[in-house]
C-alpha cells in the first residue's frame, strides 16, 4: 500500500483510521494521481457510475418517447380544432340543417349502449347523415354535451377518438363538404337538384377529377331527373370562386382544366337538347309530310 507523506509533519507515516480493506474487495482497482497523491478507484465505484449513466440514458429516452406521444396528441387536437372551426363557419350559414341535428336525442340513444365500438359509432352517424361534414358536426355537439358527465366517460373518450379519426382521415372531405353546403343548399331549394349529389359532385371535381367523360357520366347518374345545365352552372360558379382564391400552384391549374371542361359540357348539353328536340319534332310527324326515317 502506498504511504502518503504529510508535508506539515515531515515523514511521519499517517496512522490508519480504519481497518485495512480486504484484498478481495480491492480487486480490479484503477490507479491514478490527484493533486500529487496516489488515488484508487475500486471497481464497485466504476460499476456504480456505469449504472447511473445507464439510468440517466433510460430516463432521457423515456422522456423523449413521452414528448413524442404528447406532440402527436397535440397535433391531433390541433387538426380537430382546425376542421371544427371551418365546419362551424360554413354550416352555421344554413341553420335549417343544424336544426335537424338533435344532439340530445343522439346522446340519449348512445348512452344506453355502454359497449358501443368506434366502428359502430361511425356507422350510427352515417345512418343519421351521409354527409361527412354533418357527421363531424354531430360529434362536436356530442363532445360538448358530454362535458361534466363523468358517468359517461367511456362515451366521451369514444367521441374524442372518432373526432381525431375523422379529422385525420377525412379532413379535406369534411371541409370541402362544409364549404359548398350554403351554395348547394340554395341550389337544392328549387326542388330539382338534391343537396347531397351537389356536394358530392363538387367535392369529386376538386379532390379527384377524372376527366370530361367521367364527370359527364357522374352528372347523368346523380341527376337522372335533374337539371344538368343548372348543375354545371353551379359547379362553374363554385370552382371559379376557388380559382380566384388561389394565387398559383398545381391546384389552380387543375381547377382551370375542370372549369374549361364544364364549359364544353354546357355547350355539348345545349347541342344534345337541340338534337333531342329535332328528333322529337320529326317523330311526332310535324313536318308537313316529311316522316322520320
From Swiss-Prot:
Main location: membrane
InterPro entries named in the record: HrpJ-like, T3SS_LcrE
One Pfam family matching this protein: HrpJ
Entry annotated with the keyword Membrane: yes
Topology class, membrane: Peripheral membrane protein
Cellular component terms (Gene Ontology): cell outer membrane; cell surface
Subcellular location: Cell outer membrane
Stretches that traverse the bilayer: none
SUPFAM superfamilies assigned: Type III secretion system domain
Highest taxon listed in the record's lineage: Bacteria
Similarity comment text for this entry: Belongs to the HrpJ/YopN family.
Protein name per its UniProtKB record: Outer membrane protein YopN
Amino acid at each position: 500500500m502506498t504511504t502518503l507523506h504529510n508535508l506539515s509533519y515531515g515523514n511521519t507515516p499517517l496512522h490508519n483510521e480504519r481497518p485495512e480493506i480486504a484484498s478481495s474487495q480491492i480487486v480490479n482497482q484503477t490507479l491514478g494521481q490527484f493533486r500529487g497523491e496516489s488515488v484508487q478507484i475500486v471497481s464497485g465505484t466504476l460499476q456504480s457510475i456505469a449504472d447511473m449513466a445507464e439510468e440517466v440514458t433510460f430516463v432521457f429516452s423515456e422522456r423523449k418517447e413521452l414528448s413524442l406521444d404528447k406532440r402527436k396528441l397535440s397535433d391531433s387536437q390541433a387538426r380537430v380544432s382546425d376542421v371544427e372551426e371551418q365546419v362551424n363557419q360554413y354550416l352555421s350559414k344554413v341553420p335549417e340543417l343544424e336544426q335537424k341535428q338533435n344532439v340530445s336525442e343522439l346522446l340519449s340513444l348512445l348512452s344506453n349502449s355502454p359497449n358501443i365500438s368506434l366502428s359502430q359509432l361511425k356507422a350510427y352517424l352515417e345512418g343519421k347523415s351521409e354527409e361527412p361534414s354533418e357527421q363531424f358536426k354531430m360529434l362536436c355537439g356530442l363532445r360538448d354535451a358530454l362535458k361534466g358527465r363523468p358517468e359517461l366517460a367511456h362515451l366521451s373518450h369514444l367521441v374524442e377518438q372518432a373526432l381525431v379519426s375523422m379529422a385525420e382521415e377525412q379532413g379535406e372531405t369534411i371541409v370541402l363538404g362544409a364549404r359548398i353546403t350554403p351554395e348547394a343548399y340554395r341550389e337544392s331549394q328549387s326542388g330539382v337538384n338534391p343537396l347531397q349529389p351537389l356536394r358530392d359532385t363538387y367535392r369529386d371535381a376538386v379532390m379527384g377529377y377524372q376527366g370530361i367523360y367521367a364527370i359527364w357520366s357522374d352528372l347523368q347518374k346523380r341527376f337522372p331527373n335533374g337539371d344538368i345545365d343548372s348543375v354545371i352552372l353551379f359547379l362553374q360558379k363554385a370552382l371559379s370562386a376557388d380559382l380566384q382564391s388561389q394565387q398559383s400552384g398545381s391546384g389552380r391549374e387543375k381547377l382551370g382544366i375542370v372549369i374549361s371542361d364544364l364549359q364544353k359540357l354546357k355547350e355539348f348539353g345545349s347541342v344534345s337538347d337541340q338534337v333531342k328536340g329535332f328528333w322529337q319534332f320529326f317523330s311526332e310527324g310535324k313536318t308537313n309530310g316529311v316522316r322520320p326515317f
